[in-house]
Amino acid sequence: MRRFCSLFVPAVFLVTTLLVTLAQPERCIAQSVTNAPQQSKDKEGDSSGQVSGAGKPAVAGSKASDADSGAKENTNSEVKKDAESTVQIGDDRNARFKTGRIIFPTYEFEMGKKRLFYGLYLPKNFVKSKTYPLVVVLHGLNGSPGQILAYPGLTKYADNEEYILVAPMGYNARGWYGSRGKGGGRGSEPRNLGELSEQDVMEVLKLTRKNFQIDPTRIYLFGHSMGGGGSMHLAMTYPQIWAAIAVIAPAAYGNRDRLATAKDIPAYVVQGDKDRLVSVQQTRRWVEKMKELGMKHEYIEVKNGGHVFLAWQHFDGIFSFFKANPKLPQQISPK
């Protein structure tokens, strides 16, 4: 009996270890897209300014910088594949970006004296010399760039329609992109949180236009909830930039008369009539103001739709709307 136990215990331990090991890669893959770098890790990264989806330092051209990092080590064939899907920017050999993957580059945000990350998606067939339309994507309250870029179907549309997607953090997860004013900081947050949140978006936009060939007539805004309110605020604040905007359950507050500054920007609005966080009445009032101003818009009210309904079901309409609404040449602003 003693001999049997001595053989049985190691065998059970070996089988258990094997099962845990086999399960581990699946867990890594499931978490890596949505787990963008944490703010406490934002200074980590290599000279390319990239960090991994798990907040670890990335090596340019390695698996650590893409959305399915940690799944397995590179083989020789994978290294070759990585090289083919990596775009070099400028003369710096380390300034490389993966194509067809959600990645999280970082940059030095001088106003906030802090290094911030943002989400970036280059379409699979990206060509550095080609000009592309751009969608600036804004996440909701307590969300992240990785979360909203992982909305099912979003990157697929970017591939099929050949869009670059960029998702700023907005300084932190609750900055409101300036839509609630320049302040709003709580506790240890900066007093000018709203201003920092807004300027993070504008700095990431500037950086993206510098790094890639962006069509100035086709720069769009898309946001959900807090990101929808932020999109409307940025459209009203910088109307010379945006060709069109698309908002889902927009948490938009403030004076609706400001919408007059964005009356030449077409808007695509989606709202659930059972939303308990952003009331349908509030969104209807914004849409009524659009009608009053003669603003080009489409309004889709989802019957029995809540706040977190299947927003991605509307990407077909959103991208069709974007395609149909480039900015007029005389309305283009300089970089």
Predicted regions located by residue number:
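Sec-dependent N-terminal signal peptides
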Residues: 1-31
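A domain-start/cap signature at the N-terminus of enzymes
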Residues: 28-132, 197, 226, 284-288, ...
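Short substrate-entry loop that stabilizes the transition state in hydrolases
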Residues: 126-178, 276-277
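Alpha-helical scaffolding within the catalytic cores
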Residues: 148-155, 249-260, 281, 285
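C-terminal catalytic histidine-bearing segment of alpha/beta-hydrolase fold enzymes
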Residues: 270, 276, 280-335
